[in-house]
Amino acid sequence: NAADEGTQSPYGPKFPPIGFKACLQAAKAHPNYTKPVPEGAGRGVAVGFWFNVGMQSSAEVNINENGSVMIIEGSPDIGGSRASMCLMAAETLGIDYDDVRAQVGDTESTGFCNVTGGSRTTFATGMAVTQACEAVIADCKRRAAMTWGLDEDQVEWEDGQAVPGPGVNADVKPLSLAELARKAGKTGG
């Protein structure tokens, strides 16, 4: 009775590709599942599902002059969600986790966030953090292009730095997040 692509969900839309049946079949075919079990022992599989409602979350990502990052989020920390936000920001920006901090703002200092709950917060607020980091990267690429006299599409982002794209003059040296942050006052604030 496993749902798959096209199954009508109880809350409205039809499911997109899920892969659940393929996962069960792969587990069933695995040698650990097909080998005999000792007498008196059993083998079973348990599966659970919880959909995420998403809803609205807000996050702000600020880059300090030394390249460190401060996340301001509106969802109170439950079960280490601030650490999760820092991990997502570090991965998206391509910087060290130790260079990222997260702070929960009050209702006057951050955008609106719906209910804080274990099945929603890390996903929805994490998406807000990731999108904010992607906006930072786009801005950094724009600033690097301006610094180098290139078009924005000639700049890429790799490992926490703006790098010249393929075919760009080899004399153009990468600019780290910290270098771009230090130059922000001279490249449009």
Predicted features and spans:
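Cofactor-centric catalytic regions
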Residues: N1-L93, G105-G189
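Generic long, charged, amphipathic alpha-helical segments
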Residues: D98-V104
